[in-house]
Curated annotation (Swiss-Prot):
PANTHER family: OS04G0341900 PROTEIN, TRANSCRIPTION FACTOR KUA1. The gene is mybJ. One of its GO terms (biological process) is regulation of DNA-templated transcription. Its main location: nucleus. One of its GO terms (cellular component) is nucleus. One of its GO terms (molecular function) is DNA binding. Residues 371-426 form the HTH myb-type domain. Residues 174-196, 231-257 have a biased composition (Polar residues). Residues 469-478 have a biased composition (Basic residues). This is Myb-like protein J. PROSITE patterns: HTH_MYB. It is found in: Nucleus.
């Protein structure tokens, strides 16, 4: 045992504070003493983030760390520093016992110290025993290989008997059970993480050790060795890790003991062929790039010994049982050479850390380049729940983050799944609504679709009539076909409903859902309002679109007569995705800039001001700038904008307002936006005093482009210097 560890365990602590009386051996000691004063422990010590906590983490594993019943009163005092002593300055990376010896600062007795010393000595002795056992195993393996080589040479000298057949049974199950028992015994002897990492278990070592003790020949074929190596992550598949044994047909032992034979899982008879001349390192030096569902017979044809010896050509049946504890779905290798085993060697339950091992794809096939082509089928419930949670966390559009959250889908798959999901959800909500809950827009869209179908059918009918008239003189067959098509189209037109919308009463639109043809609809060439030639139909279709937009539940505004339709403010519905991009008419969270009421049809923006100041400025501007001659409402800005945007044929476009020569109203402007907006540069600069220099506004020289200074000019209006913004630049401060 090292001397430094013994000195650390037997040396007393530098700190005089006795922390946590032992519940095991010293129950009479008080729970906490710090020179009789609890306030002597420094305040504000965050032991979770301190280096001393991570350095002396081993002391938390001690049995002396448990408090007795008297220590429950100490939890109320949050200033206690349990781990503030010198022993926690030890580094956790030295050894486990260096950090474990920090228990010397606690209230330890001589019995505890002796127990720790004996525990450490037993651990060191156990390590020496393990090393000796490993050396003995290696020596026994060498001796066994030499004996097997001699026996094989003797058998080669004997004459080949054609009718002799020997069967060998692999005892992998018994060997794995013995290996598991030895792992349990070794794990019970160790009680710390570092101890467990010192003792490394290899399944091949246990296989050879068991075979050496029981004198049982184990045929370590590439399949069984690779399956055993899949349990051990520390060893890659290489010829060094696969124990090369001798002739697999040999069941006789040198000592004459009978081998222990386990039940055969699946007996398969394969003829033994002479091994190929290629060395064993060529197929196994690389990671297992071909799946295990490849033909089995060539794998057994590969040499299983390091010596270049040839087997007999006699067909001897070999019974091989391949067992993988982590895979119950492994189909045993058969002589069908069938590559289409779906459940063949899909290592989904293996806890392997190397991702370069063979990954079988659909049908048990892999690309020759080694790239995995995962063909994933439908979405599971778990994936869909993770998809919905990812949307709630990251939001729509963050497909990469949601893909990382789901874990089994690519961002493109998640995007397509989201599109399908929202379309299906929209269709379900539309089907749930009754006809009374449908908005007027939906009803009008249905009617427009029907009228558009009628127009398209009528155009097709006219084209067919022209074609039939041209070809009637030359070809009679084509004319008869055209007449038949005309008759069928006329019958379709009679069955489809037609509607004459009421133009003067848009709130009370009555849709005609009659499917039976009427007398007025029987003549196909009558001047119906749905025909494209009449100007009334064009105007009616325009008014239908206008009425549909004005009377949708997101607008609720008509041509100016508020008596027909109840006016609902837009902020009541809180819809920020309307067709007009006018989120919240009342100026709340309005990020669209179109200052001083420029009545522009092409701009969907209303207001260039941020929060509630825009509401004030909008009404101020609408009072200052008189509206054009026939405005329906003179003080509501969005009504005027709606009429100019959606009703271009009702009201003429107003001329641009003349420049205002009077002062703007004096009140604080917080976002520095332009009231008059000379050039119309709508940069949407809301609540930002520094980015609107290019906004066509000659800004006040106070706090120009200074992001760190206090916003002094917010206390004053923009026209603090009493100047006309159209005449001259403001005076500069000296």
């Amino acid at each position: 045992m090292p001397n430094n560890q013994q000195n650390q365990i037997e040396s007393p602590s530098k700190n005089t504070s006795n922390v946590g009386g032992s519940t095991l051996l010293n129950n009479n000691s008080p729970p906490f003493k710090s020179n009789g004063n609890l306030n002597s422990i420094p305040n504000g010590f965050n032991f979770l983030s301190s280096t001393s906590f991570h350095g002396g983490f081993g002391s938390l594993f001690s049995p002396d760390y448990a408090f007795n019943e008297q220590a429950s009163s100490i939890t109320s005092n949050s200033n206690l520093n349990i781990l503030n002593n010198d022993s926690f300055d030890k580094n956790f990376g030295q050894s486990f016992f260096n950090s474990f010896s920090s228990l010397g600062s606690f209230n330890q007795t001589q019995q505890q110290k002796e127990a720790l010393l004996s525990f450490q000595n037993s651990y060191l002795q156990q390590q020496q025993k393990d090393q000796q056992q490993k050396e003995q195993q290696k020596e026994q393996q060498k001796e066994q290989q030499q004996q097997e080589e001699q026996e094989q040479q003797q058998k080669e000298q004997q004459p080949n008997e054609s009718n002799t057949t020997t069967t060998t049974t692999t005892t992998t199950t018994a060997v794995e059970q013995q290996g598991a028992e030895q792992q349990d015994t070794n794990l019970n002897s160790t009680s710390s993480p570092t101890m467990m990492t010192d003792v490394v278990f290899n399944t091949n070592d246990h296989v050879d050790f068991a075979s050496a003790n029981n004198n049982v020949m184990v045929t370590s074929s590439p399949i069984s060795s690779s399956l055993n190596n899949s349990q051990d992550n520390t060893k890659p598949v290489s010829p060094d890790n696969i124990e090369n044994t001798s002739n697999p047909m040999d069941t006789s032992s040198s000592n004459g003991k009978t081998p222990t034979i386990t039940p055969i899982v699946t007996p398969i008879t394969t003829p033994v062929v002479t091994p190929s001349s290629t060395p064993l390192s060529t197929p196994l030096s690389t990671p297992l790039s071909t799946p295990l569902s490849t033909p089995v017979a060539p794998i057994f044809n590969s040499p299983t010994t390091s010596t270049s010896s040839t087997h007999s050509n006699t067909s001897t049946p070999i019974t091989v049982s391949i067992i993988n504890n982590n895979n119950n779905n492994n189909s045993n290798s058969n002589n069908n050479n069938n590559n289409n085993n779906n459940n063949n060697n899909n290592n989904t339950n293996n806890t392997t850390t190397t991702t370069t091992t063979a990954t079988t794809t659909s049908g048990g096939k892999t690309n020759p380049t080694g790239k995995k082509t995962s063909l994933k089928q439908g979405w599971t419930k778990e994936e869909h729940i993770r998809f919905l949670n990812g949307i709630q966390i990251h939001g729509k559009g963050a497909w990469k983050e949601i893909a990382q959250f789901v874990g089994t889908r690519t961002p493109t798959q998640i995007q397509s799944h989201a599109q399908k999901y929202y379309l299906r959800q929209k269709q379900e909500t539309k089907n749930k609504r009754s006809i009374h809950d449908l908005s007027l827009q939906d009803l009008i869209d249905d009617n427009l679709n029907n009228s558009n179908k009628n127009n398209v059918d009528k155009n097709k009918q006219d084209d067919k009539e022209k074609k039939t008239q041209k070809t009637k003189k030359t070809k009679s067959k084509s004319s008869t076909k055209g007449d038949e098509e005309m008759i069928t189209q006329q019958q379709q037109l009679q069955q489809q409903p037609q509607q004459q919308p009421q133009q003067k009463q848009p709130p009370t639109i009555i849709t005609n859902f009659n499917t039976t043809p009427t007398s007025s609809q029987s003549s196909p060439k009558s001047n119906s309002p749905s025909s494209p030639s009449s100007p009334q139909s064009f105007q009616s279709s325009q008014t239908e679109q206008v009425v549909g937009k004005l009377f949708s539940p997101f607008y609720r505004a008509n041509d100016g007569d508020d008596s027909n339709v109840r006016h609902i403010p837009k902020s009541f519905l809180n819809n920020n995705n309307s067709n007009n991009n006018n989120s919240n008419i009342n100026g709340i969270n309005n990020n669209n800039g179109n200052g001083n009421g420029n009545m522009d049809m092409n701009s969907n923006n209303i207001n260039s001001f941020g929060n509630n100041e825009g509401n004030i400025l909008r009404h101020q501007n609408s009072h200052q700038i008189p509206p054009p001659p026939p405005p329906p409402i003179q003080h509501v800005q969005y009504q005027m904008d709606f009429q100019r945007q959606y009703l271009p044929h009702h009201t003429p476009q107003p001329p641009p307002p003349p420049p205002i020569q009077q002062m703007a109203p004096i009140f604080p402007i917080y976002n520095g936006s332009n009231i008059h907006d000379i050039n119309g540069n709508n940069h949407n600069n809301n609540n930002n005093n520094n980015n609107n220099i290019n906004n066509g506004w000659i800004q006040s020289p106070i706090n120009i482009n200074s992001q760190m200074q206090p916003q002094i000019h917010q206390q004053f209006p923009q026209n603090f210097y009493q100047y006309n913004p159209y005449s001259a630049p403001p005076p500069t401060l000296q």
